[in-house]
Amino acid sequence: EDPYKIWISEIMLQQTQVKTVIPYFETFTSKFPNIESLAKTSLDDVLSLWSGLGYYSRAKNIHKTAIILEKDFNCSLPDTLEDLMTLPGIGFSTAGAILSLGFKKPGVILDGNVKRVLLRMSGNKSPMNQYKTEKSLKEFAKILLPGTKHKQYSQGLMDLGATICKPKNPECMKCPIVTDCCAKEKNIQNEIPVKRNEKEKKEKRIEWVLIKTKTKVLLKRNKNSGICQNLWLLPDKGFLSLDKIKNLDPVEKNFPSFVHHLSHKKLLISLNIYTIKNKDRLSINRNLYNWVNISDSVNMGVPKPVREILNKI
């Protein structure tokens, strides 16, 4: 019932399965039990705990919002839709979850489970993720809001979608609102929701180099914009100029190439591994690169494919 924890869980659950989120949520809220502790920490600390969860803009927005809440809202989440939606990363549905579950006020939640219930109730065969569909669902959900027991209503609707009104083979005869379901009446419950045709993922080739001593590995801070902004990556192949490579010893057995899937891209990743006896012989820009203890590197803010590599070296 803590609005802070509702907020963190709702952000983590965007595009991510519950079973994946649970350990991250527990670790995150243990390290940052309240808004004040989150606002006072560094973005690096936030990203390190988020590492592997993906969609890193969520973590950056959480940190930005915590700082705003400390400065302008006395370290508390506001309890109005208008104020909540001014905060980075908090949209209509997340604000609705905070209001109904955290403050027990009227609030519309439109997560995937709730959308599916509402689409079937209304017999709506529009593609689920279209803007026009979202808009009509928002209005329909507002009409259905009860006058009291807002938390119980929202939680019940989410649970209904998760356990009974499932994506495939919904258990309609167990549903408490089956008599109000337009899709069941027309026997089209298995045809809803309709999803837009997904575009084929674009492929992107990434060639990394891993340079290590016996105890340290070289990482690069990604200053570029995009999903990995401010995270630590491995240097790319272009780092290896002639004057650098002469100080390195290639490792004969290199890491096998592998594929990492993002929501919109397929990353084809190859890796060459080098060792160096004396790291001081390698000229680096210390604003971008840093030698890190191998044992510490997996706990830094690194994206999932980098973490997988570091766990295996």
What spans do the regions from the language model cover?
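Intrinsically disordered, low-complexity, charged terminal extensions of DNA damage-control enzymes
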Residues: 159-313
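Catalytic cores of DNA base-excision repair glycosylases
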Residues: 1-171, 177-190, 248
